[in-house]
């Protein structure tokens, strides 16, 4: 199956349950950047990313629209700490801002539990979540 080059993408991001509520409160999600273990690989489709789905171990899923499609910021560990987060595994992070005032109900519930890949951030088409 070939990818639709026009389709909006969703960043699927596993977060610890203790961190998920703070991310939703702040409208911020982040992933490790650089050469640290678990850092995200920016691949084709990233520029079409319009949503973020936060989950914990493939469950407790929350879908939100990004404030700026396909864009992200690079923050230091210290900048995240100044926003109330406690990052532990890298010096730099990819940060995305989302509209935390309007959670989006999604009609499809794809399998997010995929062994070790459950915990890796990935980009998936919006059609995996909405009809």
Residues covered by each model-derived region:
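Compositionally biased, charged N-terminal/linker segments
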Residues: 1-49, 54-58, 103-131
């Amino acid at each position: 199956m070939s990818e639709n080059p026009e389709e909006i993408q969703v960043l699927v991001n596993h977060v610890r349950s203790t961190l998920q509520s703070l991310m939703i409160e702040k409208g911020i999600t982040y992933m490790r950047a650089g050469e640290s273990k678990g850092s995200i690989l920016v691949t084709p489709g990233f520029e079409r990313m319009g949503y973020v789905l936060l989950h914990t171990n493939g469950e407790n899923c929350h879908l939100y629209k990004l404030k700026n499609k396909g864009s992200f910021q690079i923050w230091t560990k210290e900048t995240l700490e100044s926003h109330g987060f406690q990052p532990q595994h890298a010096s730099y992070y990819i940060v995305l801002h989302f509209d935390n005032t309007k959670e989006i109900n999604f009609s499809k519930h794809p399998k997010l539990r995929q062994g070790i890949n459950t915990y890796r951030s990935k980009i998936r088409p919006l059609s995996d979540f909405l009809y």
